[in-house]
Amino acid sequence: MVLIRVLANLLILQLSYAQKSSELVVGGDECNINEHRSLVVFFNSSGFLCGGTSINQEWVLTAAHCDSKNFQMLFGVHSKKILNEDEQTRDPKEKFICPNRKKDDERDKDIMLIRLDSPVSNSEHIAPLSLPSSPPSVGSVCRIMGWGTISPTKVTYPDVPHCANINILDHAVCRAAYPTLLAESSTVCAGTQQEGKDTCGGDSGGPLICNGQIQGIVSWRAHPCGQGLKPGVYTKVFDYTDWIQSIISGNTDVTCPP
């Protein structure tokens, strides 16, 4: 009953809450109920915050700019209107952000690793996503997903998570769209030449999935979302795999790549 009340409150608040720094999927369709088993919902007493990705039963990846006080994480949700019996709620036990992250730049090293207060149980609607074994290839078709708004011009939250296919873009294309990006950057850009398919308000922290692996974390983009010449920018997870694995193994003093 407690979980049901928490979920009900979350979903009611989610309808009216707009997070300025979050991103959301536009131009997509309802995700298949079994394709987002790793997708995590972040919320607090004010409402919906961000998305995240389960990478094993005890650890979750999200964006560093999604950090907030007193948030919880919800696993196994598909519909606001229909409860899954295997939905689970967890609190963060430990949060890890790159110690060498620029504090005055929320786009820098935009990754956070969270240890849960207790492991989640894998189930029909809950399962982790693999870390990348190699960097993403330009042109690869990848999947974005999230609970964010489905309209680039007004806040319109769906009852179910939406998914869309987009492509990994060459970093030169990204730098042409965003000249402030460094030539060597631990980010990856993804989008389509046509306007419409993109992350938008509400999707920050969620995954960019390529070949069944998490290659990116939704970080930032131009506004309004869905502009073909302004692709979404994602934290490049492959560049942080050593940092992630070191922390999980107990070496919490490790720093992130420059």
Curated annotation (Swiss-Prot):
State the InterPro entries in the record: Peptidase_S1_PA (IPR009003), Peptidase_S1_PA_chymotrypsin (IPR043504), Peptidase_S1A (IPR001314), Trypsin_dom (IPR001254), TRYPSIN_HIS (IPR018114), TRYPSIN_SER (IPR033116)
Among its keywords, does the record have Transport? no
**A Pfam family matched in the record:** Trypsin
Q: Which residues form the propeptide?
A: 19-24
Which residues, if any, are the signal sequence?
1-18
Main localization is secreted
**This protein's UniProt keywords:** Disulfide bond, Glycoprotein, Hydrolase, Plasminogen activation, Protease, Secreted, Serine protease, Signal, Zymogen
Q: Which residues are glycosylated?
A: N44
Q: In which tissues is it expressed?
A: Expressed by the venom gland.
Q: Which residues form the active site?
A: H65 (charge relay system), D110 (charge relay system), S204 (charge relay system)
Which Enzyme Commission numbers does its entry carry?
3.4.21.-
Paired cysteines (S-S): C31-C163, C50-C66, C98-C256, C142-C210, C174-C189, C200-C225
GO MF annotations, alphabetized: serine-type endopeptidase activity
> Is Metal-binding included in the keywords of this UniProt record?
no
Q: Which terms in the GO cellular component ontology are assigned?
A: extracellular region; secretory granule
Family, similarity comment? Belongs to the peptidase S1 family. Snake venom subfamily.
The free-text function statement in the UniProt record for this protein reads: Snake venom serine protease that activates plasminogen. Shows a preferential cleavage at Arg-|-Xaa instead of Lys-|-Xaa bonds.
The molecule here is called Venom plasminogen activator
- Organism of this sequence: Agkistrodon piscivorus leucostoma (Western cottonmouth)
Which classification does the entry list for the species? Eukaryota, Metazoa, Chordata, Craniata, Vertebrata
